């Protein structure tokens, strides 16, 4: 299942890159040939059609479109034949690791007796300092689980490769070379947004359901750890992952600038735009994804729902919902120039992000209320449990 989702995610990232790559006139043919869905191949012929031509002419099944379908049909057949020849029901799953695991033989030595163990004396502490320390340590465990997993590594590698290709293309405007200014490097990292969002949606679900997938959920549910610590550690791990991915945009940008012999890095601009301005956007999506993944028992179905929301919310303008205050995590953007920086547009950007962050916090509180701890028998029972948890400070924060 994971391999299938990795492949779908790679195709989506490739599609998003080709859409932006094909905006330049000289790249349209290459993008049209490589588009796995064939949309760019059709756009190659229909981009400049008038409304009358769109209503009267047939879909141009010719030339570039046929070549595009033949390319991907060949790739599909090659993959299918390779899998057919290599597949066997008796084979073990393929694994890959950089570390060689040494085999260890254990010998039982306590036959006919009972081994006496001196347990260490411990002092239980449930102070606030201990809880926050536990929160941080659990977040480190979840964070290592994320960055060591192959879906994450695969998505990051594909995203970085597409980002590097975008950097080389961004340096040329209609064939004219430009200086690799920092704000240009940040613009080139825009296609990496999809990879960060998909990692956020996927690992929010995998962390929420990790104990259940590993069949240790009942053991963890009996611990005296509060729900806000268990959820908070997972959320903090997601934020750490987002910071790492945003930092990769800065690292690739600096490496590209060095490659071009340009050393005015503007580290402050990198940090401010990536860690301050962009991180808010991803945190708001993370808050909603935790709520959705808590309600949905399957992390991959939750990923699909979040992708539908990510794509569908901007399209609500077609249905007449045009104001950004009704579209989650939407609002005015920002742009940077060497002449006047960010200008006066940041005020509106922060107002909208604070507005959506407040709603995201509401979703997070609802996540704590609906968090599945113990054995539950469906959504109806979740509502009963959430209602019983709705006391203390929760109504205050929701209000």
Region spans (language model):
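Terminal transmembrane helical anchor/hairpin motif
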Residues: 4-86, 93-94, 262, 299-389, ...
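Amphipathic cytosolic juxtamembrane alpha-helices at the membrane-cytosol interface
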Residues: 221-237
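Residue-level hotspots within the lipid-embedded alpha helices of multi-pass solute transporters
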Residues: 69, 73, 163, 191-194, ...
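Hydrophobic/aromatic residues in alpha-helical transmembrane segments
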Residues: 83, 200-204, 216, 284, ...
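Transmembrane helix boundary and interhelical loop/hinge segments in multi-pass membrane proteins
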Residues: 176-189, 201-226
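Catalytic cores of nucleotide-enabled group-transfer and carboxylate-activating enzymes in metabolic
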Residues: 13, 126-135, 140-156, 160-176, ...
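Secretory targeting signals
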Residues: 1-3, 9-32, 36-40, 167-172, ...
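Aromatic- and glycine-rich beta-strand/loop motifs that create alpha-glucan
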Residues: 91, 110-158, 375-395
């Amino acid at each position: 299942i994971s391999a299938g989702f990795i492949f779908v995610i790679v195709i989506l990232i490739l599609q998003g890159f080709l859409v932006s790559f094909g905006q330049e006139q000289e790249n349209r043919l290459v993008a049209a040939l490589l588009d796995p869905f064939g949309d760019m191949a059709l756009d190659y012929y229909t981009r400049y059609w008038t409304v009358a031509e769109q209503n009267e002419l047939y879909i141009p099944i010719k030339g570039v479109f046929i070549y595009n379908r033949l390319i991907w049909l060949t790739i599909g057949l090659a993959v299918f034949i390779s899998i057919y020849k290599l597949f066997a029901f008796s084979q073990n799953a393929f694994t890959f690791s950089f570390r060689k695991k040494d085999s260890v033989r254990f010998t039982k030595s306590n036959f006919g007796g009972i081994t006496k163990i001196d347990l260490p004396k411990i002092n239980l502490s449930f102070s606030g300092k201990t809880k926050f320390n536990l929160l941080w340590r659990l977040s480190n465990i979840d964070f290592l689980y994320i960055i060591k997993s192959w879906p994450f590594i695969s998505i990051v590698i594909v995203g970085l490769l597409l980002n590097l290709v975008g950097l080389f293309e961004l340096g040329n405007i209609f064939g004219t070379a430009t200086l690799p200014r920092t704000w240009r490097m940040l613009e080139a990292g825009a296609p990496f947004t999809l990879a960060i969002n998909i990692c956020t949606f996927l690992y929010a679900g995998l962390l929420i359901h990790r104990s259940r997938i590993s069949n240790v959920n009942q053991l963890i549910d009996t611990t005296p750890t509060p729900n806000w610590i268990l959820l908070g550690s997972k959320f903090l791990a997601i934020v750490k992952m987002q910071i790492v991915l945003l930092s990769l945009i800065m690292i690739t940008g600096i490496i590209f600038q060095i490659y071009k012999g340009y050393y005015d890095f503007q580290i402050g601009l990198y940090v401010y735009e990536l860690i301050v301005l962009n991180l808010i956007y991803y945190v708001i999506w993370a808050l909603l994804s935790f709520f959705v993944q808590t309600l949905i028992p399957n992390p991959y179905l939750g990923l699909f729902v979040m992708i539908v929301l990510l794509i569908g919310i901007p399209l609500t303008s077609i249905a007449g919902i045009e104001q950004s205050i009704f579209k989650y995590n939407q609002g005015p953007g920002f742009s940077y120039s060497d002449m006047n920086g960010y200008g006066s547009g940041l005020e509106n950007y922060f107002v909208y992000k604070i507005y959506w962050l407040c709603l995201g916090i509401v979703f997070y509180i609802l996540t704590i209320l609906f968090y599945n701890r113990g054995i539950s028998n469906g959504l109806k029972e979740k509502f009963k449990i959430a209602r019983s948890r709705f006391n203390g400070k929760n109504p205050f924060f929701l209000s």
